[in-house]
Structures are given as C-alpha cells and as structure tokens.
C-alpha cells in the first residue's frame, strides 16, 4: 500500500509545532505502508529527506504564523501549484491523504484524483470557510458562497473524510449526507508526555519555585483570544495569588501582547519563544495547569487543539474559556475547569481551591492522564487511523 500525504505544515518532533501529521505518517509506516509527504518550508530550494521511514518532499513555499489573510491565501495557493507539479512522481499510489487547513489543499487532492485516478481521504481539523467567515476575515458574500461550494465539492468527491472532533464530524455529516466521516481526534502522546514530579533544576531555570504555574503553549494569533489570558494573570496579581503564567509560542499578536503585559505590570507573566516538544516537555514539568484559550467565536469551539491533548497526557489540570465538546469532556471527566470568558475574576474563583487543596489538584490531574490513556492515546488512535486504509477502494 502506497500513501501520499499532502500537508503544508508538516512538522517533526525536532522542529516543533503540531506533529499530528508526523504521528499519522509514522503509524502508516509502522503498519508496513510506503508513505510520501509533500509539505513546504521557508527555505529557497526544494528538499527531500527520509525521516524515520517517511519520505518527505519540502516545497519552497514561505509561510509564517504572522502572515495576514492575503499572504496566507497566496501561500496556500502556491503550495497547491507545487503539489500539482510534483504529483506525477506518485501516480501509482493507492491513496492520497489531504490534510486541511487550508481548505485549498483539497484542490490538489481533486486534481490528483482526476489526473491519476487516486482516491483521496480529506482530513478536517477546522471547519473552513466557517472559521474565517465567522472571524470576519472574509466579508464578501459572493466569495463566501464560492468557498462554501468548494468545501462541499471537496467533501463530496472524497473517498471519505476524517474529522478531528465530534462537532466537526456532525457538521460534515449534515453538509454531505451519506458521506463516511471517521472520527480521529488529535492524539495524546502518553509515551512522551507523562505525569512527573517537578524538577527543582527546571523550577530554578523558569524561576517558579513555590509557584502554581499556568501555561499556555501554542499559536499566538487572533483566534486564540489571549487578551483573556492576560486578564486572568492581572486578576490573579490583584488577588495576590502565588501564580505564575507562561505564554510559549509565536504568532501575529506576540508583540502586542508583550506590550499590553508591560503596561499592566504583569511580573507574574513570562513569554517564551516557540520551541520543539523537548522544550514543551520541560515547561510542562513545572506546570500545574494547562490553559487552552480561544476568542469567543462559536466555530472555534469545534476545534481539536494540540495543547489540550498534551496537557492531558502530561497529567495537568485543564483550564479553558470556551464551550463545546471539550468543555463537556473536562466536566464529565472532572479533569478541568471552564472559566467565564467575560469575567477574569471567574478564573481566580475557580483556580483558588486548587491552590489550597493538594488532594483536589492531584485528583483532577490524575483524571486528565486517565482520559488521555483511555480515549486519546497515540497508540490507540494510530491503529484506528491505519485501519482506514485497509478498506476497499
């Protein structure tokens, strides 16, 4: 079995960032399949590498989390063009697996299906174009309708669809009746991230001795709504709680958030540069609560953020400020707290019991790890993913 994976933002454990597509590719390789990934990088020349049995082709297509909507769109289309040029090398492959976002990767998958008769499976991590429309990046009615037509066309011509959350699965099933939609959420790497005692050396390096640590690890963009995270840090400062906050990542709003934090005199907040998963592991070692934050836009509640699953695997108290399926999950499993996004003082109210009751904190943290092992372990979901390709074409 030969599988061609299209993912513009493919990362490895060494490079850092979201590595779901690496996990998926590795699962297929471990199942005895040949796997080729077409991705992109910011270097000026095309490059080919073999990474743990995965053949990776890097197209020269610049992309940065700080890009605006137009620059991102141009990058997405340039990637599609590059895939089409390269795809002829793999015309004897059995399946194409196209990973969005962006939605436009579906154009490349459709072209490969039409030209080489290779069926494709389409992965949906965020509902496009709903997300950019609800966030008002796309305001033109006719452009919006064109994007919706493209979305439906991509789903309809796919062999099947993989959804990263129950909410996304439900939405696609409504949009394209009768289409097979698999549910393969993001994965908790329970072998790499584990509950562990805080390392005094790391506590000293991060300067958080005797502190309750709340960490946000991930993209720092408009969708992440991190103004609320700063408001929580400010509310904790005013309440004189022994908390320290971290924002670890990169994105369009980093500089503005740093400026705002300085204006608020948030000595209890530290910004850390984007890092690979070894760096994330070190930060999680000293972390008590893992914070997942979103701007208050309904469609964002359907997502499947990596940081949530890393926090579960590491056995951390989960803190969120949005509703939807993740809110239901943490409340049903008693492993996290939901904080009112309009009231930062609600965070102070709900986090305070965990500062004074170690048994309560330990119970919630253990429940996080249990949920990761029971429902979201990389081993379990990798097997479910590989099984998709054993079905007849």
Predicted regions and their residues:
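Carbohydrate-associated surface elements
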Residues: 41, 167, 184-187
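Membrane-proximal helix-turn-helix segments that form the acceptor-binding/catalytic region
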Residues: 84, 104-107, 111-115, 141-163
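Nucleotide-sugar-dependent
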Residues: 224, 276-283, 288-313, 319-328
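N-terminal subdomain of nucleotide-sugar transferases
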Residues: 1-60, 236
